[in-house]
Amino acid sequence: RRQRQMCIRDRQCTAYQIVRQVYSQIGEKEVIFLPMPMIKDREKLIEIHDEDAAFTAEKLNEGKDVVFLTIGDPSIYSTCMYIHKRLKRMGYETELIPGIPSFCAAAARLDISLSENSDELHIIPASYGVEESMRLQGTKVFMKSGRKMAEVKRFLVENALEAKMVENCGMDSEKLYFSTEEIPEQAGYYSLFIIKDESETQRKDRRKD
């Protein structure tokens, strides 16, 4: 079995570091770091998630309450759901606590709506099929776009599309980009694109102008 490690201050545990700012007592708790690699090898992922769930079950069997910290909302592309589903199947009592989705927070920081009236809204993991997803009607949100920055930016420029982007939303290192031209070729993992078609409301407003 892979070794689990204590999640200590200098580890890159984003959710843990955020919680420490508002709940200092977390340092008094037993904190375990469960590796969640961002890979596409399905068999390897199943093995890792099975091990992580079994390890968590051991803590529950000791009579302890276990909290899985995650950023954003746990129901949206969150690694915690892989553990949650397994524990639920094993008969343990589980509960999901809703959070603020990154794309809602990003839209608020950019001071824009995500959709209006009959506009469609598409939430897309940027690591899968950027070009195909761009053909969707309505607002496209590409989450965790850091590794696909160059590809997304190139497609936007080649097709004369306007986009906005937020990097590290809500963090000290947050950066806002209000146009395709401003968006860099490279950015961090927590980069989120918002690409909007012109909505009917906007068209009506433009006609009024």
Roles of regions detected by a PLM:
Residues 62-77:
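Conserved Motif II region of HX4D acyltransferases
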Residues 75-136, 184, 198-201:
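Class I SAM-dependent methyltransferase SAM-binding "motif I" and its flanking Rossmann-like core
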Residues 134-209:
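A contiguous loop/helix-start segment that scaffolds small-molecule binding in enzyme catalytic cores
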Residues 33, 37-61:
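Glycine/small-residue-rich loop that forms an oxyanion/phosphate-binding "nest" at active or ligand-binding sites
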Residues 9-12, 101-104, 171-173:
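Short gly/pro/ser/thr-enriched loop/turn and capping motifs at secondary-structure boundaries
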Residues 3-8:
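Short, small-residue-biased leader/transition segments that mark boundaries at the very start
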